Amino acid sequence: MFSSPLKAYRRLVASFTGDDIQRQARKLAQEISWDAVIPGRPTVLVARRAQFSKDVEELRNHTNLNFAAISAVKIKKAQESWVPEDLRQQTYFAALLRADPELLRKLEAFGRAFLINASRRVRIDAVMAANFDYWQDEAIKLGCAALGIPFLVLSRENYTIPWTSPWLHQRIADAKFRFHGSGVACFSHATKRAMSPGVANPDDIWVTGAPRYDRWLNIAPRPASEKTYVTLVTFNLPGYGAQDLFSEVLAQFAANSAAEKGKGVTWLVKCKKRADYEEIAAKVPNGHALALTYDTPLFELFPVSRLVIGYNSLALVEAMLTDAAVVIPWWGQPKADPSQFLLDPNDPAIAEVIHIARSPEEFAALLQRAAAGEDLKRGTREQRRAVFSRHMQLPQQGTASQAVEEFILHYVAKAAGSR
């Protein structure tokens, strides 16, 4: 599969000298942010990514660890001049490298030089990334192994939609992938099962939950007078497989916003990112009274929402940690296979905590009831948290941040004991 690209890679890497490697490594090490590093604490160098950064921020605020950071994009770009584009394949890259000792040697030299240069500022006790199989992390894993530094993962991937686990198992088998780091922390037991074929010892996969949700656990219910939002979480992207449904939902949502204008309710469309925001802004009907946002945190938005509308989205799982009512629009549905859904509307446990609008008329009626101030919340706190726990581990005691701290310190101590 990789024979021609591998030959090209060998030629390219052969031309990349030891001085080139050292120069690239020094340059990359200068990009590390050492903000708020406290002397005497273990220091973890993290490869900063979207979402993952939310977990790191919680860890920084609620553990006794330092977290220095470097952009994962910069780690990737530092290697692009000598790793051909057609070889930069997630999951597959690790086995490919191990087909040639010379390639391994140069990657290890780069990773090792980067870590040595970084450690001249502050000793690095562990490195932590957001994925266990990204190609650009292989050099850092090799450098960590050479220097006796634990390479850890706090996985931002969470394989709780049923089809994703067999898909990952097959991908791991096809790629002959093995994780060459020290340990993986993940958010759910389903994710541990999904990742297990790629990790030599399943005990090195810890189920910790997600630190970003620690602050959600003690959200106090807001009085009805403060619940002034009706919130639509967008699902217009092709991956949802429900673009026509979203168009109908958006049109009805906009119509209600116009009809209820000036009555003290904000009809908010929560977009995923700026591009999503611009697309939605261009298609909303004239005369609406919608507010659009892409950067308002759900943590702030859901507690003041009377109703949250969404479809096959982690945002609806997150809403289970609040007392916001939730509705899934469910008509003209092309995806009938339950394995495709994060929350299956035909599951009785889901229907106990979430409204399922099976027609446009049912959906419109729920919007009207929310506008009138009716309390539409379904399910008890325990039922809602049980649904959340299907997808994200909730600690029996303590916090996810504490569980991740324990995970990190375990491997730091293990590495220290083997030196």
Show where each model-derived region lies:
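A nucleotide-sugar donor-handling region in carbohydrate enzymes
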Residues: 7-30, 155, 171-241, 372, ...
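N-terminal subdomain of nucleotide-sugar transferases
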Residues: 1-78
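Conserved catalytic-core segment of nucleotide-activated headgroup transferases in glycan assembly
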Residues: 211-283
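Catalytic binding pocket for nucleotide-activated donors in carbohydrate/polymer assembly enzymes
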Residues: 199-202, 207, 285, 314-392
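C-terminal alpha-helical cap of glycosyltransferases
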Residues: 394-419
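Active-site and donor-binding regions of nucleotide-sugar-utilizing enzymes
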Residues: 46-57, 74-215
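Donor nucleotide-activated moiety binding/catalytic core segment of transferases
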Residues: 114, 272-322
